[in-house]
C-alpha cells in the first residue's frame, strides 16, 4: 500500500512537471519583422499584410505558374510572383537553374516543362476568377525591368491568409528566385523542406 501511494505521488508529480515544461515552450516562430506565425505556409500573415502596401483584385488570367493578370480597381495589372520561379512553358528551360538538395541539377528540360504546365494548372485552380490580396514587399522593387508588378499574392481561406508564392514552393512547383525580399529566409526554408521530402519536381532522378 505504501509503495502504491509513493508510485501514485511520483506519477502526479511527473505529470505536473511535464505540464509546466510544455507551458514554457513557444510553438510559434518569429522573423525579423516581429510578426509571429507557425511553420510552413499556413501562417498568420495578417500583421504582415496590414503593415505592407496591398490591394484587392480579381485574377482574370494565368500566364504560367508565376505570372498572372489581376484586375484592380478597373485596371489590369500583370503580376510576377515575387521570390519564386516556376519552370518555363513558353521557352526552353535552363538545365542549370533547378538543383536538388545534393547539388545535382535537373537537366531534363522536357521534365521541367511538364512541371511548368503543372504549376500553371495549379495556379489556375487556386487563383483564376478569385479575389486575392496583392502585397508589395518593403525591400523589393515594385516593378521589374519588364514593367511587371513584383508582389506576393494572398488567398483568404476561411479567414486564414495563405501566401500563394509560398504554396508553390511547398508543393514543389517552384524554386526560390534569389533577390532581395523580406521573406527570403522563410522561402528558402520551405524550398529546402520540399527538396528533403522530394516533393513535386524535386522527385526527379537522372537514373
From Swiss-Prot:
InterPro entries: SNase_OB-fold_sf, Staphylococal_nuclease_OB-fold, Thermonucl_AS. The keyword Nuclease applies. SUPFAM superfamilies: Staphylococcal nuclease. CDD domains: SNc (cd00175). One of its GO terms (molecular function) is endonuclease activity. Disulfide bonds: none annotated. Pfam families: SNase. It comes from the Archaea. Keywords: Endonuclease, Hydrolase, Nuclease. The keyword Nuclease applies. The active site is at 80, 88, 148. Belongs to the thermonuclease family. This is Uncharacterized protein MJ1439.
